Amino acid sequence: MLQCAPKKNERLRGSCDFCTQSKLRCNKNKPSCRRCTIQQQPCVYSVARRTGRPPKRPRKANDGQEANEQHGDQDPVTSTPGGSCQQQSNHLLDVEGDGANFTLADASTTAQDRETAACTALDNALLMGGTFGFSSLLDDPLIQSDDFLSFSLCMPPGEEEGHMASPCSPPILPSIDVPHLPARFGFLESSVESGLHGRNGPHLIEQPDKTVPSSFSEMEKIYDEGLTFSGLDSAINAVTNNGKGEPSIPGTMAAHPHSKRQCFCSTSMSKLQMLVSHPTLCQKNSRARFDMTLFLEEVVFSIYRDVLQCLVCQSKSLHSLASLCICTDWVIEALRDVAQDLSSGQDNLGGFRAGLCPPKDKFSICVGRFVLDDQLRESCTRSLVRYRLRKLIPIMDTMMKLNYRGAGGALSQAIRTMVEDVRHKIESALGMMEL
């Protein structure tokens, strides 16, 4: 087996490029071998793969001219319509010859091509993600020149036209920008802005200019169509972390130094706790909106699922279970108030509106653009509350089982009491719905 490799290398050393790349035997019938003739493609013998050992002394300039004369006598029948074999040999000499430098871009590339590539890379970066990284843009071979500095970005109004930040300098964020939310969550957007800059203080952030490039318009269109909760999550993250992005979790990597995964369960629960304790939702003389209550229940259920399936904390974090119990108790209280109003016959659902258009009167509910009458509204509300309550029962049972696995202590006892209390509230609300 050891002798087969040198013999195979000897057979391939004098072969043409096509036979060498395919690792097939070449009959070396210059100027065109049999396989290249069958494939109807030019048969090229590279100078770098010629037989014999490489010379001890560096080759002279005459060797390159002799190689050009040698490869210029090939059969013109086998050449491609776009160019001759002599041009291909010259290109191979420029790339594979000794002392030659491999050029990424052709010499005929102009500054206009580089500017077009910069615009394309910028649009792709803006469409694929919310942040623009200059490091990925500078890796493009068409931009690795001084012509890139002539490319001007769309600066917002009020900035100097001649000023442009260096690509290598870190971005300067003078203020925290609250992401744009759809009209349905407009009340939360105003609350987020008041939480960032003071509840009674003036709004110091200048609204971004709407006359932006087409890529920003595409992003805003995507937000309005399908990324409703993604924009809401960014707004919650802006308030929770003061606009610094996802916070680092100190206990996760310290407890699991060999784990490459990063657990964001506590981050999600901190956002949920911020929502639950928000002044807009915790008003003494009024109840929470019905659509916001349903949204919080959906968020609680998704966090339950993430915590139970998390491979980092392995569903054993008592602090996570305690936080989820507190948030779940808030949601169950809101749903039980709705069930109590339905069972007692009191029509207090005028404030539980969900929709894009205002209702005709204060006692109607809008779902999308359709206004429901009293009977249909009560039936839909009853079905929604019953479904949401029943969905949380197996989750609470799973939490009770996970709590028994943890070490006994005051926190474990508190979680057991909270789970039993939440389970009792769920059964009580379901009983009121059946009456």
Swiss-Prot record:
Composition-biased stretches (Basic and acidic residues): 60-74
Subcellular localization: Nucleus
Keyword Metal-binding annotated: yes
Alphabetized SUPFAM superfamilies for the sequence: Zn2/Cys6 DNA-binding domain (SSF57701)
InterPro entries to which the protein is assigned, alphabetical: OAF3, Zn2-C6_fun-type_DNA-bd_sf, Zn2Cys6_DnaBD
Keywords from the UniProt entry: DNA-binding, Metal-binding, Nucleus, Transcription, Transcription regulation, Zinc
DNA-binding region: 16-43
A Pfam cross-reference name: Zn_clus
Biased composition (Polar residues): 76-89
Example GO molecular function: DNA-binding transcription factor activity, RNA polymerase II-specific
Main location class: nucleus
GO cellular component terms given for this protein: nucleus
Biased amino acid composition, Basic residues: 50-59
Region named Disordered: 48-89
Miscellaneous remark of the record: Gene clusters encoding host-selective toxins (HSTs) are localized on conditionally dispensable chromosomes (CDCs), also called supernumerary chromosomes, where they are present in multiple copies. The CDCs are not essential for saprophytic growth but controls host-selective pathogenicity.
Cited PANTHER family: MONODICTYPHENONE CLUSTER TRANSCRIPTION FACTOR-RELATED, OLEATE-ACTIVATED TRANSCRIPTION FACTOR 1-RELATED
Role of this protein: Transcription factor that regulates the expression of the gene clusters that mediate the biosynthesis of the host-selective toxins (HSTs) ACT-toxins responsible for brown spot of tangerine disease by the tangerine pathotype which affects tangerines and mandarins. ACT-toxins consist of three moieties, 9,10-epoxy-8-hydroxy-9-methyl-decatrienoic acid (EDA), valine and a polyketide. ACT-toxin I is toxic to both citrus and pear; toxin II the 5''-deoxy derivative of ACT-toxin I, is highly toxic to pear and slightly toxic to citrus.
The protein's name: Transcription activator ACTTR
Gene (name only): ACTTR
